[in-house]
Amino acid sequence: MQIFIKESTNKKEWFILDLQGHLEYTGDLKNETLGILTKKPNTKDDFSFQIGNSVLVGKRVPLKKPLLVIKKSKLNNNNNSNNNNKMAVDNKDNKDNEKDKEVEYSIEGICNDKIQFTTRPTTFIPQSSVVYGSPTHKSPSSSPKTISPVKVSPTSSPIKNPEFNN
């Protein structure tokens, strides 16, 4: 069997994402965006990776040995039209068809570094979903929606006609 290798001309920087734990997903991930990987500003090796509402922080680590990223494709050079009408269940003819198919590997890139995420993910809450004025979310002083905290007692509840169990 001959293996043909061709190199693509466009240079891309490839990384391995080294995550601790496991990712759970539903459905097919084919042609889907897994997350957003960004390089932190004013740093050389720090990256952040946002998956859904989780954010991971990692560092760029060089690999001991580089890895080659390749893509396998099958080439069918069978020009004989008599074999096209035969069924694939015929073992003798199926072996002949496999010999006519050649495999080609194209080099997509070389991976020299990995981004290693060693800490647990932090939860990312968009600023628009935070309600200021609650005891858990202190309002910044520059916010126009600043609500001064009001002490609520059973006798001075903001709810109309409150019912309390005594």
UniProtKB/Swiss-Prot annotation:
Residue spans with biased composition (Polar residues)?
Answer: 155-166
BP terms from Gene Ontology: mitotic sister chromatid cohesion
Q: Indicate, by first and last residue, each region the UniProt record lists as having compositional bias (Low complexity).
A: 73-88, 134-154
* Basic and acidic residues bias: start-end ranges: 89-101
| Residues forming coiled coils | none
Per the record, the domain of life is: Eukaryota
**Annotated GO CC locations:** Ctf18 RFC-like complex
Using the UniProt annotation, give all residue ranges assigned to the region (Disordered). Answer: 73-101, 126-166
Protein's name according to its UniProt entry: Putative uncharacterized protein DDB_G0287975
